[in-house]
Amino acid sequence: NANLNEVLGVEPEVTLGELREEIERAGIDPRYQIPSGMTKQAYLEMRLSDAIAEEDDYDLMVMGRTQGQGCYCFVNGLVQTQVQKLQSHYPYIVVDNEAGMEHISRGILPMMEVAILVSDCSRRGVQAAGRIAKLMKELNFKPQKTGLIVNRVPDGKLDAGTLEEIRNQGLELLGVVPHDDQ
């Protein structure tokens, strides 16, 4: 997600989106240079370790965003490749995606044990979470567990309409996060 690092108070040295810009603009824009004799692939491999912010209890890799026009295909491919490389080094990998279905429909994260969908307490938000859960089934994703966390809930209590929509979508409610003005 483009702002999870901000919520956690982590400033990465570089994001995957910024790496994409470096690679795309190398040789065209003098601000972006790859060392002489080094291929773009070798440079990318070297710089990917800079995209992981190492904290006391976790490490964080930030996708970020591109600086200009362009497809996220390259960055999405980086995320997929890095998750595959890193999964043997960590007991857990949490991927915080932007809202929507792109990461699921593109198969960027094909292997997952647990899928936690997060929604606000609006009917539309819960319906979107239900569509994502259905898409995962259609695309043959097989997490061992799929559930919903509802975020920003007034007084930490879901109203009857939201609970009914969660049931209608066939989602398992894992928990709620109360609204916090801070």
Feature names for model-found ranges:
Residues 182:
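C-terminal boundary of histidine-terminating zinc-finger modules
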Residues 3-6, 69-70, 103-104:
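Short active-site-adjacent helix-start/loop capping segments
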Residues 1-56:
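N-terminal phosphate/diphosphate-binding loop that engages ATP/GTP or pyrophosphate donors
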